[in-house]
């Protein structure tokens, strides 16, 4: 089975083209593939298929709202093998792969996901690099919109706002947090949060207050741990930072350890613009891949 390896601001993925959705994935196979010692290593896996093929193969029970059979479908799995609704960095890499491989000839097209359709605009593309904007849909503040939820990260307690970006986020902006303190946080330590409020877990962003139109953040993704970037997390961070200033709309640059992205929040949707890099192409050893399925 052929693969590509790519990243969006160092949030890295294994891309598996499987247009007819013929390959059966187990959580153990995905986890092994993403393991940085046992497999190729990645924050997640992007299966490239169509929505219609995914339904026919049983990957989807039904088409997500707004997604048609002919749309491309990003079947995204976290590094632990669990299924995820959406990944903003993953969509950019997914779109880059489609254009660079010749599977898609248009610069503007729809990528389906469990969170619904995502319109992408590929501003530049070559075999190595791409610049992609993703319409991420409306990001919704949950609850009162104020910092109503608490979490302990790296031994430090933060208050945050819950944001739905097609997947759940807890964005914690601390006006007193310095860049040095942000860098020193141990995001590998156990995270303590209210499991009643977030029974399925939540992605957690810790961010500074905006300065000159920029916020800086780190992220702990559910099912993965700390990653160098999280696309939906940068959207959630922008929503939280704007809300702290009493604004519902605006544009911010969000700096993560893996680089910068630009987030625009409007009354009706949100946009994520950033880079994608395809670093490798290869072929998985069938004997290894299918031995993992047999061992489950």
Curated annotation (Swiss-Prot):
It holds the Pfam family DAP_epimerase. This is Diaminopimelate epimerase. It comes from the Bacteria. The active site is at 87 (proton donor), 230 (proton acceptor). One of its GO terms (cellular component) is cytosol. GO terms for biological process: lysine biosynthetic process via diaminopimelate. Pathway: Amino-acid biosynthesis; L-lysine biosynthesis via DAP pathway; DL-2,6-diaminopimelate from LL-2,6-diaminopimelate: step 1/1. The record marks 169, 221 as: Could be important to modulate the pK values of the two catalytic cysteine residues. The gene is dapF. NCBIfam families: DapF (TIGR00652). Catalyzes the stereoinversion of LL-2,6-diaminopimelate (L,L-DAP) to meso-diaminopimelate (meso-DAP), a precursor of L-lysine and an essential component of the bacterial peptidoglycan. HAMAP family: DAP_epimerase. Its main location: cytoplasm. Homodimer. It is found in: Cytoplasm. GO terms for molecular function: diaminopimelate epimerase activity. Keywords: Amino-acid biosynthesis, Cytoplasm, Isomerase, Lysine biosynthesis. InterPro entries: DAP_epimerase_AS (IPR018510), DAP_epimerase_DapF (IPR001653). It comes from Mycobacterium leprae (strain TN). Its EC number is 5.1.1.7. Substrate binds at residues 11, 78, 88-89, 167, 203, 221-222, 231-232. Belongs to the diaminopimelate epimerase family. It catalyses: (2S,6S)-2,6-diaminopimelate = meso-2,6-diaminopimelate.
